[in-house]
């Protein structure tokens, strides 16, 4: 409390006091290193570079914030739901840290109005707000530490915007979300039951794999086929979001799967050239939203 009063007095003499006040309204405290928060809201499409020529955006902070957010929300959920099993806690945490929820939270606290991005670029997607939220968490962690970060989530996010008990009862269909994503991006998705066994108490256990364009996305187990599919779909969605190498492999496989068989006749060669040009155009302009 005293620290905030001191920061407020110092703020009167700063040229950038408007930015500090803006972040204070969101955070409930004044930043010590405001540059961290500004970078957290800097989308890669702006193509801003540091004095050393390195790209300056929020991707590294997003990476850090993703890990910190998982830990903090796991901590909060663990304390709130005393005695609940690991599977329940994992699912509840997933509902909070999923991209759609983070998008909404970013809008609720006003981050969407502060994000800087290039309107000329089509590289940003519908998850830009959620990504910025994660980067913002990373900035808080570096600026103030874990405990302050946890207090921000509890007092400024969970209490005003999330009913944990109600959320825990809400069922999220990860399989439907994955299928919806695949249809939007014209990707072939398959669910394969690869193993069925019994646990120590002779309960049936199922294991399912998800493949996108033939590339393994995720594997999940469960006490029913539906549960194993849901877990596999959830893992695949996380991989789509956070594994660029996986998505590059999927795109390459999709391109190869769409290449037509060769024909040596002059007419077919001309047709094949035209088709390849069309495919190249589609690939070059297609955006995968994850």
Swiss-Prot record:
| An individual GO BP term | mRNA processing
Q: Which residues form the active site?
A: 66, 134
Entry-linked InterPro entries: dsRBD_dom, RNase_III, RNase_III_dom, RNase_III_sf
What catalytic activity does the UniProt entry give for this protein?
Endonucleolytic cleavage to 5'-phosphomonoester
EC no. given is 3.1.26.3
Spell out the residue ranges making up region: Disordered: 254-290
**Keywords assigned:** Cytoplasm, Endonuclease, Hydrolase, Magnesium, Metal-binding, mRNA processing, Nuclease, RNA-binding, rRNA processing, rRNA-binding, tRNA processing
Cofactor names from the entry are:
Mg(2+)
The record's section on CDD domains has: DSRM_RNAse_III_family, RIBOc
For the keyword Magnesium, the answer is: yes
Residue stretches making up the RNase III domain: 20-145
- UniProt GO cellular component terms: cytoplasm
Localization in the cell:
Cytoplasm
Residues bound to Mg(2+): 62, 131, 134
UniProt cross-references to SUPFAM superfamilies, sorted A to Z: dsRNA-binding domain-like (SSF54768), RNase III domain-like (SSF69065)
Q: Which residues form the DRBM domain?
A: 173-242
| UniProt enzyme class | hydrolase
Subunit structure as annotated in this protein's UniProt entry: Homodimer.
The family note in this entry says: Belongs to the ribonuclease III family.
PANTHER family membership? RIBONUCLEASE 3 (PTHR11207:SF0), RIBONUCLEASE III (PTHR11207)
Purpose of the protein: Digests double-stranded RNA. Involved in the processing of primary rRNA transcript to yield the immediate precursors to the large and small rRNAs (23S and 16S). Processes some mRNAs, and tRNAs when they are encoded in the rRNA operon. Processes pre-crRNA and tracrRNA of type II CRISPR loci if present in the organism.
Question: Per its record, how is this protein called by name?
Answer: Ribonuclease 3
Native organism: Bacteroides fragilis (strain YCH46)
The opening ranks of the lineage are: Bacteria, Pseudomonadati, Bacteroidota, Bacteroidia, Bacteroidales
